[in-house]
Amino acid sequence: MPGVTVKDVNQQEFVRALAAFLKKSGKLKVPDWVDLVKLGRHKELAPSDENWFYIRAASTVRHLYLRGGAGVGSMTKIYGGRQRNGVCPAHYSEGSKNVARKVLQALELLKMIEKDPNGGRRLTAQGTRDLDRIAGQVSAASKKIVQ
């Protein structure tokens, strides 16, 4: 659909559709250790979803589409959470820097994002075009369900 952007569609459906697109394309380089790693110090267990790397990559691209100029440090703050310390008070803890770095590097190899000269990463024209195309597909699918 012309004129449909990422901001116009349901974000959960969009992230799922983009993750499916990244997995189906087979070009996203997934590290060998994805089934062993926790996503942050504040997590007790590794993710239960086996496709979590694709979902994280899709979520990261969506975030860069909406805000842009985010780097590894910004992504660790976004994916951080509450660190439980037993009987001591809970505090905020950042997400895994290695996971954020590997996701950004994998997306750079796909030419969806590039390094911003002002710091961080930003979407390329090809990445924006792909995201808008997938948003159009999600919008068309949701309109088909409503009718």
Curated annotation (Swiss-Prot):
Gene Ontology cellular component list: cytosolic small ribosomal subunit; nucleus
Protein name (record): Small ribosomal subunit protein eS19
Statement: the UniProt record of this protein carries the keyword Amino-acid biosynthesis: no
Organism: Gillichthys mirabilis (Long-jawed mudsucker)
PANTHER family: 40S RIBOSOMAL PROTEIN S19
SUPFAM superfamilies, sorted: Winged helix' DNA-binding domain
Function, in words: Component of the small ribosomal subunit. The ribosome is a large ribonucleoprotein complex responsible for the synthesis of proteins in the cell. Required for pre-rRNA processing and maturation of 40S ribosomal subunits.
GO biological process: ribosomal small subunit assembly; translation
Family membership noted in the UniProt record: Belongs to the eukaryotic ribosomal protein eS19 family.
Subunit annotation: Component of the small ribosomal subunit.
Recorded GO MF terms: RNA binding; structural constituent of ribosome
Principal localisation: cytoplasm
Alphabetic keyword roster: Cytoplasm, Nucleus, Ribonucleoprotein, Ribosomal protein
Location(s) in or outside the cell: Cytoplasm; Nucleus
UniProt xrefs under Pfam families: Ribosomal_S19e
InterPro entries (alphabetical): Ribosomal_eS19, Ribosomal_eS19_CS, WH-like_DNA-bd_sf, WH_DNA-bd_sf
